């Protein structure tokens, strides 16, 4: 698999709570790649939590920092990168993401909500109707997420290991398509 990928980065996109970080770690280990979570890189670089950045700079300020981090990350190879759920919202980010293979972890709202219900660290979910907010965000982002090279549909019974296996099995078909185009 590593020889097929030739060091190309994997970028995991999808909603908050989709499992990008967990699955990303597993994929990195399987491939012998490094692993980065853009939200963690942002928090380390700014010495602030994502909530603090949202509170101080707003979503637009956070998205700019996120784009700056992604611009730097895409110059490296052999990385599996878990991105923030809204990274797809800025057109400039797509030019960075296209330096690698883009994997969409597509998770239904009910599963996302079950995973995130007790999480108070998500600024976009500080809402009177967090499930409705999730549904709205997913509807807004689905046309963008669907531009990924590979869509992995996740169901409630699947473990992170099973999802990572699904990704590993699907990657060769996408790379063959890319190579033949």
Curated annotation (Swiss-Prot):
Positions contributing to substrate binding: 39, 63, 85, 141
EC assignment: 2.7.1.71
InterPro entries linked to this entry: P-loop_NTPase, Shikimate/glucono_kinase, Shikimate_kinase/TSH1
Cellular-component GO terms for this entry: cytosol
PANTHER family xref list: SHIKIMATE KINASE (PTHR21087), SHIKIMATE KINASE 1, CHLOROPLASTIC (PTHR21087:SF16)
Pfam name, any one: SKI
Catalytic activity: shikimate + ATP = 3-phosphoshikimate + ADP + H(+)
The protein's annotated pathway: Metabolic intermediate biosynthesis; chorismate biosynthesis; chorismate from D-erythrose 4-phosphate and phosphoenolpyruvate: step 5/7
Taxonomic lineage: Bacteria, Bacillati, Cyanobacteriota, Cyanophyceae, Nostocales
Name this polypeptide is given: Shikimate kinase
Signal peptide stretch: none
Record flagged with keyword Amino-acid biosynthesis: yes
Role of this protein: Catalyzes the specific phosphorylation of the 3-hydroxyl group of shikimic acid using ATP as a cosubstrate.
Comment on bound cofactor: Binds 1 Mg(2+) ion per subunit.
NADP found in the keyword field: no
Residues given in the record as Mg(2+) binding sites: 21
Principal EC category: transferase
Cofactor(s) for this UniProt protein: Mg(2+)
UniProt KW keywords: Amino-acid biosynthesis, Aromatic amino acid biosynthesis, ATP-binding, Cytoplasm, Kinase, Magnesium, Metal-binding, Nucleotide-binding, Transferase
CDD domains: SK
UniProt-listed GO biological process terms: amino acid biosynthetic process; aromatic amino acid family biosynthetic process; chorismate biosynthetic process
Quaternary structure note: Monomer.
């Amino acid at each position: 698999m590593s020889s097929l990928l030739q060091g190309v980065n994997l970028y995991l996109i999808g909603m908050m709570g989709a499992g990008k970080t967990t699955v990303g770690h597993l994929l990195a280990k399987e491939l012998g790649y490094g692993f980065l979570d853009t939200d963690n890189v942002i928090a380390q670089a700014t010495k602030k939590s994502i909530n603090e950045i949202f509170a101080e700079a707003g979503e637009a300020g956070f998205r700019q920092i996120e784009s700056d981090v992604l611009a730097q990350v895409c110059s490296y190879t052999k990385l599996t990168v878990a991105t923030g759920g809204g990274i797809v919202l800025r057109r400039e980010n797509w030019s960075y993401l296209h330096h690698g293979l883009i994997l969409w972890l597509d998770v239904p709202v009910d599963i996302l909500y079950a995973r995130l219900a007790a999480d108070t660290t998500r600024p976009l979910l500080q809402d009177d109707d967090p499930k409705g907010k999730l549904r709205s965000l997913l509807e807004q982002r689905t046309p963008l997420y669907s531009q990924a090279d590979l869509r992995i549909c996740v169901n409630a019974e699947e473990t992170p290991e099973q999802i990572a296996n699904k990704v590993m099995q699907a990657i060769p078909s996408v790379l063959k398509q890319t190579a033949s185009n």
